[in-house]
Design a protein with these regions (language model features):
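Active-site catalytic microenvironments in core metabolic enzymes, especially phosphate/sugar-handling
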Residues: 4-117
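Internal active-site segments that recognize and position negatively charged phosphoryl groups
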Residues: 1
């Protein structure tokens, strides 16, 4: 809960393509509901695979209920830089933040939900 309380953005570095352990699903969902308006981004520790939260049931459910943004094929460094810029320069409008997050800058993201592999 400390992370949700203290930070405006949370970057989750998942297992594989976007798996979230089922054991934390309920607690994470409750925190998302309690701290609405936070930017929550799913990244992956797999360097060349990218994220796809629709592969596993828990990830699919969490993406829908917690408004996760996905890194897809962005590197963790790109995700961090974009997130920091968005927090400093963008309003609290989630739709604007999402549009800017998925805007390609210097080929940092090639695949998104609309044009996923």
């Amino acid at each position: 809960e400390y992370v949700f309380e203290k930070y405006d953005a949370i970057i989750v570095e998942s297992f594989g393509v976007g798996g979230i352990p089922i054991t934390i699903r309920e607690k994470f969902f409750a925190l998302c509901q309690k701290y609405q308006g936070k930017m929550i981004i799913m990244a992956t520790q797999v360097a060349h695979e990218g994220s796809d939260m629709t592969v596993y049931e828990v990830g699919h459910d969490m993406k829908a209920s917690c408004n996760f943004l996905e890194s897809y094929d962005m590197t963790l460094e790109s995700v961090i830089a974009k997130t920091m810029w968005l927090l400093a320069n963008c309003t609290d409008d989630a739709a604007s933040r999402e549009k800017l997050f998925y805007t390609c800058i210097n080929h940092d993201i090639l695949f998104t939900g609309a044009n996923q592999r």
